[in-house]
């Protein structure tokens, strides 16, 4: 039994789909059709890279909205992998276009992205207690909640940052056998701080990924989810490279602080209200 009638698409869309699927030699013969009108013709465009693609797509949505030919909720951007959402999200934000990711999480809210950004934040400014606490056991270092609590209590008592308390962990009451693990973390962060003086942002990020074994651990899991997370990390690396290229083109210095400031502008975006007019972003 072949289910060939389509009730939602236009015939032009189905004709294009038929043309693409026809090249699959292992498929069973099937031709999709509809009683709907032919609809608008499909426009096919190729771009040199993802940046040009996202800029054109979002620019086209903005133009249609500006001209009154489409509302935001009439528009959707479909892509193959979650990692591709980052460019479309950023372009939408720059164009002040509301959007909603369907069936996924905003790029900068994904666990692996937040973990690695917190490493960069800690290297840049170890007084960021939230960032330091997030990565203290990423990867797992065997520093338990009780130890973390004692260190935080000491930091509060001495009115110092959590990281400064880590640096003098030997003075924390009842720190016990966790001291060597805490010292190992501090030594690691201090080495990254030293390297940050000579490394570019992208080099520093790749060094963190390499030394923590973050991607190696994900690859060892070898699941669909872990592979998607590796793609997200690759996309974050691409973002650092893009930032450096932009700064170079503008004859400005690419700094870790500058990169984190740029990310901060787009990372803390509240979710779109369900009743608002927004563009839909989603994977196929």
What are these regions (language model features)?
Residues 14, 112-115:
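Short secondary-structure transition/capping segments
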Residues 3, 7, 106, 140-141:
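Phosphate/pyrophosphate-binding and catalytic-coupling "lid/hinge/switch" segments at subdomain interfaces
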Residues 1-6, 165-167:
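Conserved phosphoryl-transfer catalytic core
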Residues 71, 85-97, 110, 117-284:
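Conserved helicase C-terminal RecA-like lobe
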Residues 96-106:
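Conserved RecA-like helicase motor-core motifs
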Residues 5-98, 121-125, 157, 179, ...:
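Helicase P-loop NTPase motor core
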Residues 78-80, 102, 282-284:
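Generic beta-strand/beta-sheet core signal
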């Amino acid at each position: 039994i072949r289910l060939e009638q389509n009730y939602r698409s236009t015939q032009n869309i189905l004709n294009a789909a038929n043309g693409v699927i026809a090249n699959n030699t292992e498929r069973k013969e099937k031709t999709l059709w509809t009683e709907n009108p032919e609809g608008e013709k499909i426009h096919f465009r190729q771009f040199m890279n993802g940046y040009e693609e996202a800029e054109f797509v979002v620019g086209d949505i903005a133009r249609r909205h500006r001209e009154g030919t489409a509302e935001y909720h009439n528009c959707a951007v479909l892509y193959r992998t979650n990692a591709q959402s980052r460019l479309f999200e950023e372009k939408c934000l720059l164009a002040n276009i509301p959007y909603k990711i369907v069936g996924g999480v905003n790029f900068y809210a994904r666990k692996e992205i937040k973990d690695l950004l917190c490493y960069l934040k800690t290297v840049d400014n170890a007084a960021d207690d939230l960032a330091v606490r997030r990565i203290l056991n990423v990867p797992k270092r065997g520093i338990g909640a009780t130890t973390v609590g004692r260190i935080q209590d000491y930091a509060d008592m001495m009115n110092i940052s959590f990281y400064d308390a880590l640096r003098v962990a030997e003075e924390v009451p009842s720190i016990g056998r966790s001291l060597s693990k805490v010292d190992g973390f501090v030594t690691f962060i201090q080495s990254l701080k030293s390297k940050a003086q000579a490394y570019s942002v992208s080099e520093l990020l790749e060094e963190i990924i390499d030394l923590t074994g973050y991607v190696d651990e994900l690859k060892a899991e070898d699941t669909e989810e872990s592979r998607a997370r590796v793609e997200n990390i690759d996309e974050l690396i691409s973002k650092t490279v893009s930032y450096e290229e932009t700064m170079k083109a503008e004859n400005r210095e690419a700094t870790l602080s500058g990169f984190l400031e740029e990310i901060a502008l787009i990372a803390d975006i509240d979710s779109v209200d369900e009743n608002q007019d927004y563009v839909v972003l989603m994977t196929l």
